Amino acid sequence: MDRSDMMHVMYDKKGPKVAENFAKRGFEAYYCPTKEEALQKALALIPADHVVSWGGSVSINEIGLRPYVLEHYQVIDRDAAASPEERVELMRKALLCDTFIMGTNAATEDGQLYNIDGNGNRVAALVYGPKQVVVIVGMNKVAPTLEDAVVRARTVAAPINKQRFAAPTPCIVTGMCADCNSEGSICNQFVRTRRCSPAGRIKIILVGENLGF
């Protein structure tokens, strides 16, 4: 058994239990061993007549969800904006869509989400607005404790994510979080989601593969 196989075995052992822990906190939660199964589960959760939007996420692209939604659903796509002003308006409209799809920076084994956001539109939609939120969570994002999840979000996810943006920050240069107060920081909103209310509004799809960063 090679390293990759061992990883999947461990994910398959842990994933269903983590899904159970999310369910105990009011989330609707599923474990899917593969990206392909995760895509089918996500599509089964999104009615054909829903207007769909999304937050910045590598994971929703890696399972093929965003490309499928773009082709088969009515969407609110900020990347289709013709100007910065229109982009902002589309991001605002996305807060009232039917289904919002996103990834997460970190999750915990006891069933919590932890996210860091720049503009705040992604975490705003998670907290309130869309009728439902579908969150794609690679098992590599699952940390043992909340403290570990915070460390993961700040020192792993955020510095890597920041490499996609031009505004200079210390982590672009060093690859490490400096807890900066830079104008170009994407670490502006820190949101812990410890329960889902109303119950079932947030759907968690845990995936037995490494997704995103």
Predicted region positions:
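Short, functional N-terminal and low-complexity linear motifs
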Residues: S4-M10, K35, I116-G118
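SAM-dependent methyltransferases
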Residues: M1-R25, Y30, H50, E86-E89, ...
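N-terminal active-site beta-alpha-beta segment that forms phosphate/nucleotide-binding
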Residues: Y11-M91, L96-F100
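Unusually extended, aromatic-enriched hydrophobic runs near protein termini
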Residues: M1, Y11-V18, I63, L70-Y73, ...
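Conserved phosphate- and dinucleotide-binding cores of soluble alpha/beta proteins
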Residues: L95-F213
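N-terminal start-of-chain detector that recognizes signal peptides
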Residues: M1-S4, A23-G26, Y73-V75, E86-V88, ...
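Generic serine detector
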Residues: S4, S53, S57-S59, S182-S185, ...
